[in-house]
Amino acid sequence: MASTNGETDQVLVEEKSSVRIFKLNRTKQLNAISAAMTSRLLELFLACAEDSSVKLIIVKGKGRAFCAGGDVAAVVRDIKRGSWKSVADFSRKEYTMNYVIATYSKPMVSILNGIVMGAGAGVSIHGRFRIATENSLFAMPETALGLFPDNGASYFLSRLPGFFGEYVGLTGSRLDGAEMLACGLATHFVQSNKLPMLEEALIKANSSDPSVISSIIGEFSQIPNLKKNSAYHRRGRLQRRKTIGSLPQFSH
């Protein structure tokens, strides 16, 4: 797992029995995914996949964000400098990492206790277990930048109920933890004060059996109530508007 100091600092690794915990560590940038972070995460995922002593991966963020997305500022800087190859290399590694996570041979638990947007979704939503909390805030805000939801969003958004995924992708609508659970972006909802106990239980279990892991998470999870003004309550109306074919009506 050789890497530069910069890459190592941006992803902290804890070894707890058969569990490996990857902690995103760019707190000043809300853990935005950088080229160095992408390289390090990809290296770690590939190494752990081949390590028979590793049974479970836990991914979380340090500070108040899980991951606020890709490091757009660095990408813009490279483009202005004419460093298109750097941008292409970053994107290639990032999308490769998304694929590795989506096809990973070992269970992965993403603890989404805070902001999870854009590339942050790519490093978490493709995993088997996604835990939302009362602090979770999800969005795919790329459309506001003149882009489109990437990092595999065309896969996971298209599988949300009705046309809710299209709505989230088109509008960049922000979802809280309860909405993430309701629409399927999260598999579980756990109050943040229970997360340390959950981690300890997962470590103590020493298991790679998805049913065992799901059962453990279930012991700490709950089904929260949606807000009265939640966009998810309007999913039936969104479906009717999409059928009519009016994009402005569908988006508002």
Report residues per predicted region:
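Conserved CoA-thioester-binding segment of acyl-CoA-metabolizing enzymes
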Residues: M1-K60, Y99
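Glycine- (often His-adjacent) and acidic-residue-rich active-site loop
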Residues: G61-T96, A144-G146
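Gly/Pro- and small hydrophobic-enriched strand-loop and loop-to-helix capping segments
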Residues: G127-D150, G184-E199
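Hydrophobic, secondary-structure "cap" segments at the distal end of domains
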Residues: S154-F163, G245
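Loop-centered beta-sheet repeat module
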Residues: L160-N206
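Amphipathic alpha-helical blocks and their helix-capping loop/short-beta junctions
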Residues: Q191-H252
